[in-house]
Amino acid sequence: MVVEEENRSMEEGLLQHQNDRDDRRITACVILSTFVAVCSAFSYGCAAGYTSGAETAIMKELDLSMAQFSAFGSFLNVGGAVGALFSGQLAVILGRRRTLWACDFFCVFGWLSIAFAKNVFWLDLGRISLGIGVGLISYVVPVYIAEITPKHVRGAFTASNQLLQNSGVSLIYFFGTVINWRVMAVIGAIPCILQTIGIFFIPESPRWLAKIRLSKEVESSLHRLRGKDTDVSGEAAEIQVMTKMLEEDSKSSFSDMFQKKYRRTLVVGIGLMLIQQLSGASGITYYSNAIFRKAGFSERLGSMIFGVFVIPKALVGLILVDRWGRRPLLLASAVGMSIGSLLIGVSFTLQQMNVLPELIPIFVFVNILVYFGCFAFGIGGLPWVIMSEIFPINIKVSAGTIVALTSWTSGWFVSYAFNFMFEWSAQGTFYIFAAVGGMSFIFIWMLVPETKGQSLEELQASLTGTS
């Protein structure tokens, strides 16, 4: 009897060891699925950086005023808000994969409308359509990646979304000043066309399948993601039990997310998006050439160096997010962005006083690199990583929609107001951004939880007090 018990214990121990090893396995399917999902993020980055390099050429060819071009730039955020409003519901009704197809439709139409625009109407329509597409992307891509990846690499894989966005921005910055703006719009559509094809070869999210009660499909999806020879019964059971428990606990009405147990997650999600946008990132990204021009730095040289610089910084975040955790990177990012903004403001103050005029262009440019380097490894992408992790499945639609909508509406405000603020006071604009960075540090320190190393079910249970 004792021998049988010992044998059983050994078998259970070996099985647990095997399951732990399987949980840490990264399959080709996970890599392919993540790559396909982030193709549209590359297009998103192209859209974000597009107005900077194309500003002079578009305004000249289509005879646009500064107000018209500012509106064109900000319409990406207007469309993004519309896309964000419907993103969660679409992801539930259609599933994650088919929602990605919807993203591709809006993005390809938007890029081609811009590429062949003969007047401001088609230009703006294309920008709005592109915005709707990237508004959907901003929700569904990080959610899909978080739902398919093993917990020990979830942060890095989800952060690859930001890496591809930065790569898109870099491409536009590097080539935008030397390639015709219409050709660049066509190039921006290519990743979405590739994604449209790639979606045929990737599995649906097992957590979405669990939500719609497709038990066999949950295991089938997990087998593709974890390996055919892997025992996925434990993970499948955990996903289905947690999903069922949450849905029984709440009927998933819009008001559910305002329950006391979800209050912290909602405040964290909304707060991080406000930090990301009100720190000035959209305005600086959209109109960086105007900043270079004001500082007296070469627009072409500045854009090309920026394009090379930003990708390695995003890679730092990708490598460290599952080693150091989300909080340390967010805190370091907030400090660095605040210092960078402060020093840019000081530079423009010295320029106005005609102090060290020969050094001001270099000083402004270096601190823009500091700002964006710190943005890239932290606040640029980690708010979306955390958003994809902290909301339980029963409120993920409503809460995720509100959080994404917050990002896009605040981004619209910054992107539209930036040119007018910059004309009012270059230094004042960056002092405001520096103050936001300082407040961001306090917010992150006091409220943002560490999410690394936990399954989505474990994390959400700890945040909401569900056992």
From Swiss-Prot:
The keyword Membrane applies. Its main location: membrane. InterPro entries: MFS_dom, MFS_ERD6/Tret1-like, MFS_sugar_transport-like, MFS_trans_sf, MFS_Trehalose_Transporter, Sugar/inositol_transpt, Sugar_transporter_CS. Pfam families: Sugar_tr (PF00083). It is a multi-pass membrane protein. It is found in: Membrane. Signal peptide: none annotated. The chain crosses the membrane at residues 26-46, 75-95, 105-125, 128-148, 155-177, 183-203, 266-286, 301-321, 328-348, 359-379, 402-422, 428-448. Keywords: Membrane, Sugar transport, Transmembrane, Transmembrane helix, Transport. GO terms for cellular component: membrane. The keyword Acyltransferase does not apply. Coiled coil: none annotated. GO terms for molecular function: sugar transmembrane transporter activity. Belongs to the major facilitator superfamily. Sugar transporter (TC 2.A.1.1) family. Sugar transporter. This is Sugar transporter ERD6-like 11. It comes from Arabidopsis thaliana (Mouse-ear cress).
